[in-house]
Amino acid sequence: MSGSTGERSFADIITSIRYWVIHSITIPSLFIAGWLFVSTGLAYDVFGSPRPNEYFTESRQGIPLITGRFDSLEQLNEFSRSF
């Protein structure tokens, strides 16, 4: 049998009151913080994603789909000019 490292076992940790006091606060807090991050629209600003009403503008109603293999750079430039 191998030697002990002196650390507490996992079963000992998850059955302790201290573990559940700490995690009963932090887990719901992380969930609420994530929900607020997404619901307020801050996630769109931080990651630069377009909001749902900004995907298609009045001038650009089609999907920016690259169809040519050899002229893909020109198509990308055309799509970027339409923004």
Swiss-Prot record:
GO BP term (any one): photosynthetic electron transport chain
Compartment(s): Plastid, Chloroplast thylakoid membrane
PROSITE patterns: CYTOCHROME_B559
Coiled coil: none
Keywords on record: Chloroplast, Electron transport, Heme, Iron, Membrane, Metal-binding, Photosynthesis, Photosystem II, Plastid, Thylakoid, Transmembrane, Transmembrane helix, Transport
InterPro entries given in the database record: PSII_cyt_b559_asu, PSII_cyt_b559_asu_sf, PSII_cyt_b559_CS, PSII_cyt_b559_N, PSII_cytb559_asu_lum
Regions crossing the membrane: 21-35
Cellular component, GO, one term: chloroplast thylakoid membrane
Cofactor note as given: With its partner (PsbF) binds heme. PSII binds additional chlorophylls, carotenoids and specific lipids.
The keyword Transcription regulation is assigned to this record: no
Pfam families cross-referenced by the UniProt entry: Cytochrom_B559, Cytochrom_B559a
Membrane topology according to the record: Single-pass membrane protein
Protein function: This b-type cytochrome is tightly associated with the reaction center of photosystem II (PSII). PSII is a light-driven water:plastoquinone oxidoreductase that uses light energy to abstract electrons from H(2)O, generating O(2) and a proton gradient subsequently used for ATP formation. It consists of a core antenna complex that captures photons, and an electron transfer chain that converts photonic excitation into a charge separation.
Subunit structure of this chain's protein: Heterodimer of an alpha subunit and a beta subunit. PSII is composed of 1 copy each of membrane proteins PsbA, PsbB, PsbC, PsbD, PsbE, PsbF, PsbH, PsbI, PsbJ, PsbK, PsbL, PsbM, PsbT, PsbX, PsbY, PsbZ, Psb30/Ycf12, at least 3 peripheral proteins of the oxygen-evolving complex and a large number of cofactors. It forms dimeric complexes.
Protein name: Cytochrome b559 subunit alpha
Organism from which the protein derives: Citrus sinensis (Sweet orange)
